[in-house]
Amino acid sequence: EVECLPGPTAFVPALVSSGLPSDRFSFEGFLPVKKGRTKRLKELSTETKTMVFYESPHRILKTLNDLSNYFEVESQISVSRELTKLYEETFRGTIKESVEHFEKNKTKGEFVIVLSPK
């Protein structure tokens, strides 16, 4: 088990604890909410390196569903919330499993998604 100490950004502990390849990655931040979202997802769908996204609790399920439409559903993903806080939680699995998990488990907090498209 890896424990990463907090720093100034949430994506670094999420990336390290994800267990996904971190030798090459891109930080994508928040995906566009409306305008440009589909275009950005299409652009990212050909990416081969690990990608890191931020997402709000109100859009987490939509974003996971969108990712499942543009990437292989068996792609590995890690979804972390409330990093370094009392209710810290990380889900690891496939995109498909993450959609199923978050359909059943409504959670609060800000999320960091780490996606390995390979």
Locations of regions flagged by a protein language model:
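A contiguous loop/helix-start segment that scaffolds small-molecule binding in enzyme catalytic cores
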Residues: 49-50, 54-118
